[in-house]
Amino acid sequence: MPTFPLSRLAGLLLALSLAAGATFGAEMKADLKATLKDDKPAKEDAKAEEEPVLSVTAHTLMVNGQPLKYHATAGYLILKEEEGKPLVKGAASAPAASDADKAKEDEKRAKDGLTPKAKVFFVAYTLDDVADPAKRPLTFCFNGGPGSASIWLHMAAMAPRRARLTADGEAPPPPYQLEDNESTWLDQTDLVFIDPVSTGYSRTFPKENPAQFHGLKEDIASIGDFIRLYTSRNTRWLSPKIVLGESYGTTRAAGLSDYLQGRYGLYLNGIILVSSVLNFQTLEFTPQNNDPYIGFLPSYATTAWYHQKLSADLQAKPVAEVAALARTFAGTDYTLALARGDTLPAAEKQRIAAELSRFTGLPAKLYLQRRLRVSDALFFSSLLRDEDKILGRYDARFTGPRYEPGTDASSDEYDPSDEAVTGPLTAAFNDYVRRELKFESDIPYETTWDVSPWNFGDAGSGFPNTADDLRKAMTRNPYLKIWVTCSYYDLATPFFAAENVVASMNLDAATRANLRFTYYEAGHMLYIHQPSRAKFKADFGAFLHDALRQQPVRSAAR
C-alpha cells in the first residue's frame, strides 16, 4: 500500500500502498496445459527444479443481470536466469556457494540452460466463451510499496470477488465476509494480479538472495519477465495489453512501459496510473525542496473542505472548485514566495501565511513559525487537533483518536484509513484463496514486507523518477494511451504533484493527446469508496474504448 519518500524509505519501505537489465532467460518449455488441474488444490512445491501446479477453478458471476462465466488460475510462474545474464548488471547476487551447491546448480542449469531464481505468485481471471481469446484485452495489475502484494487491487477494486466494506470504505466488525463485485472489470478485460518477489506468496529459491529483486531496475525487470512469460505461456501476444499500477506501482508501470518495448518488443495499448508517483522529489519534505509543499497544498485544501474547516465562502463551493483555486495559488504566489526564501519581505510573508491559513484551515501563526512550510505529517496531526483526532494519510476522509489525547505529541501515530481496510482484505484473501481458488500454502501471505534497503540505482542520493521512461515509451509508441487517476483526499500521492510531473514531461502535442486524468472524491485506494468504484469502472470502459479503436498513424504526420 504505502509509498514513502526517500527519508522514510529506510524504515518504512513496506507496502502499497518503482530500463535496464538482461533477461531471466528464454521461455520455459513446459506446456501450460500439462500443469493445470481443474478444481483441485495446488500445494506449494518446495523443489526448485519442478514447475508448480496451477490451481484452475470455474466460476459464475452475475453482472448487470447477466451471468459471467470465467476461470480463475492461482499459482506460480518461475523466473529463470540464463547463465552469465543477470537480471540487472551490478544487482545483488546470491551468497558464495559451496562446491556441493555449485554442483547442484550446474545440474539444474544443464536441464534447460536456465537457473530458477524466484517463484512469482499470481491470480488470473479469464472469461469463458470468448470467440477469439487471443484478441481479448488483458490487464496486468499490481500495487506498490515497494513491498506490497496486489491484495488491495485484488480484494477491493476490479476482481470478480471482493472483501465486504461499507459504501464509504469503512470496515465492518469481524468476522469479515466476501461478496460479488458489482464493479468487476472482467466483463471488459481478462485480469492478472501479480505479487512481486518477497510479497504475497512470491519467494526466491533457496540460496538466492532476495536483494537481487529489491531495486528500481531489478523490480521492473522481474515484473517485465513475468509479463513476457505469462503472455507466452497463455498465447496472448496478439491480445491488447494494459498495465495498471497503484502508488509505487505507478513508478513500476512507467518504467515497464519503456522496458517492455526495449527488452522484449512488447508494445502496450495502455498504462493506468492509480494514485501516481513518478518522481519522488514531489514527496520528500525537506527545507531545501519546495516541490512537496507546493504539490500537497491543494490536497490540504480539499481535505480541510471535507472536514468543514474552511471559511464559509470556500465551504459553499464544490470540492473541484476549491481544488482549482488552491492549484492557482500554489502554482503562483506560493511557489514564488517559497523560491524567495529568507529574502521574502515580512509583509508578503504575512499575506502568504494568511492565504495558506484560508486554504488549509491551519493557523497563520503555524505557517509563520515554519517558514510557510507544513509537512504532510504535521498536517495529519494538526487539522483536527482540537478534537483530539488524526487524519488518515491514504484517505483523509478517515479519522481516529490520537494515541496521546490532550497533548501536542504526534509521534508514532497510526493511519486510520489503513486500519480500516487491512483486516478485512487480509482475512478475505486468506479464506478466498483456499476455499474458492483451491490454492494451499503453509507460508504466510505477506500483504506487506520490508524490502529495504531498496536499490535506487542511478538515482543515487537523488530522487527516483520514471517519468522519463514513460516519456520515451509514449514518444516511440504513438498508440500508447496513459490514464492517470487522482483522488481529492489522497494525502500519500497528491493530485497536483501528479499533474505537475506529467506536465513537465516535454511531450509534443500529438503525444500529449494520449494522456487523460480523472478525479475521484475518495482517497489513495479510491475503489474502497463505492461511488468512486463505480465511476472507476465506467472510466476504464471509456479508456479501453479509446485505446482499442485507434486509426493507423503515418510516421510522416507525427
Where are these predicted regions, by residue range?
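Short alpha-helix in the alpha/beta-hydrolase fold that links the catalytic acid
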Residues: 255-256, 369, 373, 480, ...
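Catalytic histidine-centered segment of alpha/beta-hydrolase-like enzymes
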Residues: 521-532
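Alpha/beta-hydrolase fold catalytic core
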Residues: 337-492
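N-terminal cap/lid subdomain of alpha/beta-hydrolase-fold enzymes
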Residues: 27-43, 84-212, 503
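Alpha/beta-hydrolase active-site loop
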Residues: 185-189, 196, 213-232
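A catalytic-pocket lid/entrance helix-loop region that shapes and gates access to the active site
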Residues: 160-164, 257, 261-360
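Alpha/beta-hydrolase fold nucleophile elbow
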Residues: 235-248
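Bacterial N-terminal signal peptides
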Residues: 10-21
